[in-house]
Amino acid sequence: MSSLSTSDLASLDDTSKKEIATFLEGENSKQKVQMSIHQFTNICFKKCVESVNDSNLSSQEEQCLSNCVNRFLDTNIRIVNGLQNTR
């Protein structure tokens, strides 16, 4: 992957600059979602998995993890929707 210098970016037309800015915003959003999911999974793993004795999780552990992460995601979606409605 090649890198762009400041002079390269300055020489771009406004449309290209906007496209790059939009792309970067999208990538930042994706990164934030991935970080949140990682954080939720980590919290839920600590909550749901008491010990690692096997290479597989028990059905109770799997269900707990799934429910836990889904509740975190549901909560975040409600918060985002609430924030958007207040704007």
UniProtKB/Swiss-Prot annotation:
GO terms for cellular component: mitochondrial inner membrane; mitochondrial intermembrane space; mitochondrial intermembrane space protein transporter complex; mitochondrion. Keywords: Chaperone, Disulfide bond, Membrane, Metal-binding, Mitochondrion, Mitochondrion inner membrane, Protein transport, Translocation, Transport, Zinc. The keyword NADP does not apply. It is a peripheral membrane protein. Disulfide bonds join 44-68, 48-64. GO terms for biological process: protein insertion into mitochondrial inner membrane. It is found in: Mitochondrion inner membrane; Mitochondrion intermembrane space. A motif (Twin CX3C motif) lies at residues 44-68. Its main location: mitochondrion. One of its GO terms (molecular function) is protein transporter activity. InterPro entries: Tim10-like, Tim10-like_dom_sf. Mitochondrial intermembrane chaperone that participates in the import and insertion of some multi-pass transmembrane proteins into the mitochondrial inner membrane. Also required for the transfer of beta-barrel precursors from the TOM complex to the sorting and assembly machinery (SAM complex) of the outer membrane. Acts as a chaperone-like protein that protects the hydrophobic precursors from aggregation and guide them through the mitochondrial intermembrane space. Heterohexamer; composed of 3 copies of TIM8 and 3 copies of TIM13, named soluble 70 kDa complex. Associates with the TIM22 complex, whose core is composed of TIM18, TIM22 and TIM54. Interacts with the transmembrane regions of multi-pass transmembrane proteins in transit. Belongs to the small Tim family. The twin CX3C motif contains 4 conserved Cys residues that form 2 disulfide bonds in the mitochondrial intermembrane space. However, during the transit of TIM8 from cytoplasm into mitochondrion, the Cys residues probably coordinate zinc, thereby preventing folding and allowing its transfer across mitochondrial outer membrane. This is Mitochondrial import inner membrane translocase subunit TIM8. The lineage of its organism: Eukaryota, Fungi, Dikarya, Ascomycota, Saccharomycotina.
